[in-house]
Amino acid sequence: MTKLPPIEQLLPHDKPMILVDRALDVQQDTIHCQVDIAEHNPFFYSASHTVPAYVGIEFMAQSVAAWSGYHALMKEQAPPIGFLLGSRRYTSECDAFSRGQVLDVYAEKVMEDNGMAVFSARIELQGTVVATCQLNVYVPSKEKLQEMKIRSQQ
C-alpha cells in the first residue's frame, strides 16, 4: 500500500472543519478513510461524548473530496473546490458515534459526467456497516468557479 499524504493536503478545507482524520487507500474509483471520534471534532458533544450520526454525511462527503484531492495531486494540481449537491437515502444504525470509536469510511464512484458525480458511500465500525448513502457532487471547472464567484458578488 502506498503511503498517502496527510489529509490536510487532500482537502480544500482548513481546520477545524477537516473532519476526516486520514486516508488509508485510494484507487481509481474508490477511497477508504478513517475518522476518530474525539474532542477535536467540532461536532463533538462533551456532555454525551458523542458526535451525532447525521455528521456521517459530512464524513462521507469529505472522503469523496479527499478522493478528488488525491487524484488532483497526482496531476500536480491543488485539491479542487467541490460542492455536495445532495445526499440520498442516508440511513444510520445509530443516533450518534461515541468517543473512542474509529470509523472506516468508504466511497465508490458510481458515475461521473462533466464535473457531476455520484458516489455510493458507507461507514463501518469494526467491520459492521453503520451508515450508508448516495452522494451527488459537483466539481466546477476553474472557469465555471470564477463565474460563480463573480455572480455571488453582484
Where in the sequence are the language-model features?
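Hydrophobic core residues within well-ordered beta-strands of beta-rich domains
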Residues: 17-19, 103, 117
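Beta-strand-rich interaction surfaces with strong enrichment in secreted/lumenal proteins
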Residues: 8, 34, 92-96
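Residues located in well-ordered beta-strands
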Residues: 19-22, 86, 91, 106-108, ...
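Short Pro/Gly-enriched beta-strand edge/turn motifs at strand-loop
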Residues: 1-7, 101-105
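HotDog/MaoC-like acyl-thioester-processing domains
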Residues: 66, 98-101, 108-154
